[in-house]
Structures are given as C-alpha cells and as structure tokens.
C-alpha cells in the first residue's frame, strides 16, 4: 500500500480555530455523556441501594471479565427528550467480554422510572438484539423493569418495531441457536415478564426478583385475594412451582456468578476470523483531526487527510481513484484489521458505492461529510461517521473497541 502524505498546515489560523472549537465541543459532549450515564435522581439511587441492589453499571462491571472494556451503545438515547427524565433511555446496552467472548448485555436501570420502557428504550433494546443476531453474540438480559411506561404507551406499542418486537427477536435468536440468559434482579411486570420467560436460562434473585403480568394490587382488585409480590411471583415460586426460572440466587452478586458459570461454555457459533497484520501507529497525530473538521459545515475537507490519521502507518490503497472523484474508496488496516473505506466530500455516486460494497466479509468505515449513521449487516460491519464528530468517536470507539 502507498503511504499518504499530508498537505495540512497545522500552524495556520484556520487549523487552530477549528481545533479550539472542536476541543470545546468535545468537552461539552463528555460533560453531557457523564451526566447522562449517572442514572436516575440521587433519591432514586439511594432508594435502590437501600434495597441492597447493585446499580445497573455495577452489575455489568461484575459480569464482564476483569480489566476488559465495555463498549456502550446508544448512551445518549433519550437525551433532551421528556425533560431529560430518561437518561440513557433508562436502559444500558453494549458489548462486553465474558470468559473471553464478546457478549451483548442489556441492563434495565431501575433508578430511571422504575426501569420502564418509553419509545427510545424500546428502540435501544431492539438495536442491541439486532447486533447480537447479526454477529451471533450471546445475549444477557439484566431485568429490573416495570414494563411499558404507561403515560407513553401510544408511542411504545403500535409500531412494527416497537415493544412486541423484543419478544419476536427473542424467538428468532433462540431459533438461530444464540444463547440468551436472563437475570431477574427486580420487578418484571407486564411486558417485562416475557423477557425471562422467553430466555434459554433464567436466574432469579431471592426476595428481590419477581415475575408476573399483574402485581398484588391487580390480583386484589380482580379477585379480592391479598398476596405479597414474593408469594405471587418470587424466586421460590418460579424455581420450584412454575418452572419459569432455572436458577435461585441469594443476591445480585450470586446471580451474576451463576450467569458467568453458564456462559463459561456457551454453545454459540464461532465468529469469523479476519486476517490481521501487526499494528502500526498512524504517521500523523490523530489529535490533528480537531483542526481538520471545519467549523463552517459548507467547507469541504479532503477525506484523505482524515484517513491518514486513522489507518495503520497512514497507508491506503485507493480504489477507482479517477472515477466519481467526489468519493474516495480503498483499503487499509486499522489496529491490524483489514478495512474497506468509503469517504465522500461532495455528491455521493451510488454506482461507485455499490461496486465497492459488493466486497464481502470486511469491516467497512464510511466517512460522510453530512451525517452520522451506524449500519450493521450480516456479512460486514459498517460504521458511518460524520467528519464533524469524527474526533469524538476516535477516542471512544477506535481506542476502546478495536484494541
């Protein structure tokens, strides 16, 4: 491959202005992200801990292998919606490493509206299932949910890709032989009750986890009978009477250890092996991306200046260099992985795009001047990253996940 040479003037006034603006934007982004990942209100967090329950992120930390990263997905879902009462849409999703294998983790955050689902919660849950399905990754549900958020039920239930799709996906995952493990760590009411019932193996925590379609108040209203939540759908009932749950746990920590034991040898298809090469650092400092992205969005940027600061050794084998010149396509390596790159800085000629995309079984990095969109397909892992926020993604996705 040829080594790209930069024509960028890093001492120019424009570069310094761009860098200053985007460092400011990055700081703002990190501040919003931190606030959004704190969970519910301090009062809700305190009440959660009083019940001797671990927080959702603490549960994930215990599940994944020590000193391994957790690639969180959709962390800003629900941001600036519903008066920001649904940080991270009340659910944490991502990919972690359990016994050396990538595993999709979906954890309800009960400190946010009792772990209930509004429209963005549903979409975030579905997206995580889709990633598990397309990449044949084991799926772990850490269930602590009151089901649908009833004040917003008109936006949760009606659509094809709304609440019921979760259970459709569970059936498909099961049919594909992809393991699904549910840990019932709190309330599983109404729609939330179906998740553990449809999983391959279910763990339930004593005096804490409950599974029922309607709780004690509904039973009393319908039949006049008074029962406790534990009597109606607790760990003892579901492990010894109904058989809905398979494993009885004393507390959150015990439940997570049982889950790790189950995942020690899952029957799941081996992921595809990619031909990797030794890793090389880019010849140009990736932090220069701050100065490349223009403050004025109307100004175009040569995507090669971006590519040479991302790929190994700044080496790039361009494909169809003289055809549809507003699109740059080619091959490179990132962290030793073979990558196909598509970048545009003008009109996107779909004929060139389609020709390039017919190559199978490669990671695809799409650099688009106008939008940010993530795409996952069965035969390729495609990521679309806006030049405007590439500097933000660089230090989260690239450093944590590909390493």
Where are these regions (language model features)?
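Terminal amphipathic helices with adjacent charged low-complexity linkers/tails
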Residues: 250-302
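Short hydrophobic targeting helices and cationic amphipathic motifs
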Residues: 367-372, 376, 387
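Amphipathic alpha-helical
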Residues: 51-77, 284-316
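N-terminal amphipathic, basic-rich helices that act as targeting or association modules
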Residues: 1-97
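Structured core elements
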Residues: 95-97, 104-106, 140-142, 181-184, ...
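Thiamine diphosphate
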Residues: 111-137, 145, 150-202, 347-358, ...
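Conserved catalytic cores of soluble enzyme domains
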Residues: 143-271, 403
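Non-catalytic terminal/interface segments that mediate subunit docking, oligomerization
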Residues: 76-107, 111, 133-134, 298-358, ...
């Amino acid at each position: 491959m040829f080594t790209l040479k930069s024509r960028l003037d890093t001492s120019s006034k424009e570069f310094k202005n761009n860098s200053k603006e985007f460092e400011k934007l990055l700081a703002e982004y990190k501040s919003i992200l931190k606030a959004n990942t704190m969970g519910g209100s301090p009062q809700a967090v305190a009440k959660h801990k009083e019940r001797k329950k671990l927080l959702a992120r603490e549960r994930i930390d215990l599940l994944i292998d020590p000193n391994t990263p957790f690639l969180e997905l959709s962390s800003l879902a629900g941001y600036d919606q519903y008066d920001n009462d649904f940080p991270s849409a009340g659910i944490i999703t991502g990919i972690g490493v359990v016994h050396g294998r990538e595993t999709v983790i979906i954890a309800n955050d009960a400190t946010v509206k009792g772990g209930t689902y509004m429209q963005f919660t549903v979409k975030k849950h579905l997206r995580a299932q889709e990633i598990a399905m397309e990449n044949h990754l084991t799926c772990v549900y850490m269930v602590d949910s009151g089901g649908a958020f009833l004040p917003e039920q008109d936006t949760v239930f009606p659509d094809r890709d709304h609440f019921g799709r979760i259970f459709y996906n569970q059936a498909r995952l099961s049919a594909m032989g992809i393991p699904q493990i549910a840990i019932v760590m709190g309330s599983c009411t109404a729609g939330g009750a179906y998740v553990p019932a449809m999983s391959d193996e279910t763990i339930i925590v004593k005096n804490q986890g409950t599974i029922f379609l309607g709780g004690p108040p509904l039973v009393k209203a319908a039949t006049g009978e008074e029962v406790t939540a534990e009597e109606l759908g607790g760990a003892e009932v579901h492990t010894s009477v109904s058989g809905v749950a398979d494993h009885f746990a004393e507390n959150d920590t015990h439940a997570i250890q049982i889950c790790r034991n189950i995942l020690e040898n899952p029957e799941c298809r081996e992921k595809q092996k990619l031909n990797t090469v030794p890793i090389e650092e880019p010849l140009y400092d990736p932090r220069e991306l701050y100065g490349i992205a223009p403050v004025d969005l109307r100004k175009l940027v040569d995507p090669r200046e971006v590519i040479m600061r991302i790929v190994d050794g700044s080496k790039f084998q361009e494909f169809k260099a003289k055809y549809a010149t507003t699109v740059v396509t080619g091959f490179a390596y990132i962290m030793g992985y073979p990558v196909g790159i598509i970048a545009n800085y003008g009109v996107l000629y779909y004929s060139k795009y389609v020709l390039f995309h017919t190559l199978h079984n490669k990671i695809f990095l799409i650099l688009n001047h106008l939008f940010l969109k993530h795409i996952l397909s069965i035969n390729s892992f495609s990521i679309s990253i806006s030049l405007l926020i590439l500097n933000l993604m660089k230090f989260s996705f690239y450093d944590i996940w590909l390493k």
